Amino acid sequence: MKQLIILVIVLIPFSGISQKKNSYNSIVKEEFIFTPQSEHSHGSSIVALPNGDLLVTWFQGSGERNADDVRIMGARLEKGKSEWSKPFLMADTPGLPDCNPVLFLNNKNKLFLVWIAVQGNRWEGSILRTRTTTDYKKSGAPVWEWQDNILIKPGDEFVSEIENQFDKMPGLHHGWAEYAPLYDDMIKEASKNQVLRSIGWMTRIKPLILSSGRIILPLYSDGYNLSICAISDDDGESWKPSKPIVGRGPIQPALAVRKNGDIVAYMRDSGDSPARVHKSISKDNGESWSYTVKTDIPNEASVELYVLNDGRWAFFGNDLNDGRYRLVLMLSDDEGETWKWKEYIENDDKQGGGSYSYPSLIQTDDRLLHITYSSRTSETEKSIKHVVVDTDKIR
């Protein structure tokens, strides 16, 4: 994804993180889902099925938005087995790249696959697509029962919210300080285009499903360089847009619910330097969001967030400003105010190290945390990695 204008790079150390890998000896298992190979394999999502199977999806091909052979792939780890199935096709739109798949179950245990088909080989032309089924318990790929596009139409509230939130944001004194007003005005003006604001919304992270059954699917736009959510109150039959999550570069939201009902979004930084995770809060079940503020967590790639069954929050991402050679799992017992426990899952040297990114998290009934992410150690060694962590050991 693009960076816009970067004038100054300020590297601020993220204090308190040990540089050791697996210091708590919490890793139960780590494996490649398929043998590393040369095709680009990226953007995984994992779901635990009711029968105990694990299902993973990712996109794979000769590139990303510019490669029309990119398709959505998947693999299954059947309950009681130790090896993943051979990869199988999950979706392939003829003549278009398919990217950024997300898997989830609604409250009725219907399986959803949501992804983007990239029109015109531009992220801004992406269309949200979905497949659903209840026939997913057998070996191999799910048998899809329905396919459709997810169309959302942000209205005049989109325009007014962008204007109001940018006006509320404090000025900058570094990085984009000179250009921020021009940038803000550019986004305000672009928001008035009804066509542009109706397309180009992309998936990355699984949705948040509230106790009410409401599905909040986080989306982002490479054109507007900000985020939004698609909301469904009928188990995914229909969708409406939230108000935008406004900031200078907050994309790819990951969501978690506080005990008081507030929803917190952590987002990748696609804005000014230094790159830090953005944070926004919704107090009305995802309908509207505060303008984003930067946390002190370094990160310029996709992040994940998950509330564990012991109440702690899990954050996973690259705590770096200069690459993807390190991945950290951080745990919090105060809903993200502080991160007391930190465990490195990947920790290579910058020079000659691998690239690890775009994670997905779930916790299974046995309390184990399952993590999938993209792994590239050379141009001929690309795969999706699966790591199982016993978070009870991280204390």
Task: Please name every model-derived segment.
Residues M1-L4, M202:
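Positively charged n-region of N-terminal signal peptides that target proteins for export
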Residues L4-P13:
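Sec-dependent N-terminal signal peptides
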Residues Q19-R395:
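Asp-box/BNR beta-propeller blade signature and adjacent active/binding-site loops
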